[in-house]
Amino acid sequence: MISVWKPLFLACRSLNGDVAVYPVGDNRHIDSILHETVVPADIDKTATEGAMDAAKKVMEIFDGIGMFCVEMFVTEDDQILINEVAPRPHNSGHYTIEGCVTSQFENHIRAIVGLPLGDTSLIRPTVMVNLLGEEGHSGKTYVEGLYDVCALKGATVHIYGKGVS
């Protein structure tokens, strides 16, 4: 495996060209499917700066307006490989709803309607866990352990009500 780290950058570009960048996150995958995003990522300053430079270059190349998610691999020899660029709010950034001063959704709207971008600062360390239903399940959503999770101080659960897994 070439990757030692899968950093995630969320950035938003406004109509006037201002760019707001969220704290770097660490995406963790199981069987190539996002399992969790941990913010802030536990990485060294040099790797963070290199990945941040790569994310900014991607933003310049795309020259778009609104939210962008840039996922990348950083190899053992610190080579940066872009894995995905999503020009939209992204499931990796759902942590921003409670974890940051301004969510990715609010900043996306601000950007496309010409309002100043909001503060992207992290309020507190945050983990977003991607809950997926059993393959082939259809019908009402049931989350095992929901009561226990909701009893945790600071925990929030978002259930999107998709009809089919």
Language-model segment annotations:
Residues 1-70, 74-77:
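Internal nucleotide-binding/catalytic subdomain
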Residues 3, 164-165:
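Short glycine/serine/proline-enriched coil/turn segments at secondary-structure junctions
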Residues 4-7, 67-69, 124-126, 144, ...:
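Short beta-strand-initiation
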Residues 23-26, 84, 131, 159-161:
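Pocket-edge structural micro-motifs
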Residues 32-42, 84-97:
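Short, flexible active-site loops
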Residues 49-70, 76, 86-135:
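Active-site "cap" helix and flanking loop/linker of ATP-utilizing ligase/carboxylase catalytic domains
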Residues 79-81:
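PAS/PAS-like sensory domains across diverse signaling proteins
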Residues 123-124, 131-164:
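Glycine-rich active-site loop/lid that clamps phosphate-bearing ligands
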